[in-house]
Structures are given as structure tokens and as C-alpha cells.
Amino acid sequence: ETVEFATKPSLACAMIQRALSTDVPFSWVAADSVYGVGSIEMTLRRAAKRYVLGVSSRHGFTSWGKSYAVSGTAKEIAAALPEDAWKRLSSGDGTKGARLHDWAYLDLADLDAGDFGADFTGTWTRGLLIRRNIADGDTSYFTTWCPQGTSIETLTRIEGHRWAIEDSFETAKNELGLDHNETRSWHGWHRHVSLVMLAFAMTAVIR
């Protein structure tokens, strides 16, 4: 009765806040577009944490303080890029080898980290990372926040870490029965998931 509905972005913010308050060591956060931006972005910036966060094709981007001007939706900006702006990179290894895509990165604004926390120093960059599927040209978009000079190779590698989470879910479902649960109560669901996660942790150590 004390559990209230919460959106995925608010759940993610609460998770990040708990990690920060208990000094969990981490430098990057990667997420797909379902988690949104805005509050998550500000939470991470104020904690001096880097991020690669998925956004929709309609998300707007604008450059400032740069020698070049960029303004428009993520989709419009990607469509206007010349072919030599793209770089073929692997975001990590999958079951069939390297996950190769074409990538483009635009650093849009350099900001003083001190604007987000009195103890922070240095220049950080807000950017737009774009992933294009080699086979069909389908594109995905990410807003980024990282120290100035961070390479596109680093950003693509961080984005690729999300796949490990998806692989873990698949393993937990196929081998440990994560989705084999039809209880309707919170306690029943929570106990089932907790036991599956314990089993998953044990198998990860054994392997």
C-alpha cells in the first residue's frame, strides 16, 4: 500500500541518487531513450558523472561557442552530415563478433564544470552521438556529457555496455526463469526476482 507508481525516469533518478549517497564508485551512466533526459542529465552533471543517454529523433540540439553552427532535431542534424563525418567502429563484442556500426559525434558546447558544483573544475563537453546501422541505415541518437577531449571511441564503447545488460536479462530468463512468474503481489514478484538474481550472481562467479 505504500508503493506508488513511478515512471522509469523517476526510478532511474532515485537509483542514481542512492548510488551517489552510498558512494558507489562509477564514472559513466548509459541508458536508452525510454529513460528520458532532463532531470537525469542534471542529476549526473551536478555529481560530475559522465553519460551517454539515448534520445528520440525529435530531440533538439544547438551548438554554442563553436566555430560551426548546429541547430535542429537529432534526425535533421544526422541527415545533414557529410559521409566523411561517419566512422565505422565497434561498440563491443556480441555473440556473432564485433558490433559494428557507423558513428558520428558532434561536440556542441564546452562548459565550465564549476557551473554545476563548487568543487568541480575543468571543461566538460555536451555533445550529440549518432549511431547508424550498416545494413539498413537506421539511426539512434544520444546526448553526451564528458570531459573535453573525450574520444568518439570511448563514447561508443560506453554506449555498447548497455548490451551487456540486455544479455544478462536474456540469460536470466532463458537459464534461470526470471520471466517464469505469474504472481500478482509485490512480495511474490520481489521474492522471485531476488532469488533469480542471487542465482544469477552465483553462476556469474562460477563461470
Residue ranges and their predicted role:
Residues 25, 164-169, 181, 207:
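Intrinsically disordered or highly flexible coil/loop and linker segments, enriched in small
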Residues 160, 164, 173, 177, ...:
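Hydrophobic alpha-helix feature that most strongly marks membrane-spanning transmembrane helices
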Residues 6, 188-196:
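Short, conserved micro-motifs enriched in small and acidic residues
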Residues 1-5, 50-164:
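An anionic, glycine-rich sequence signature occurring as long contiguous blocks
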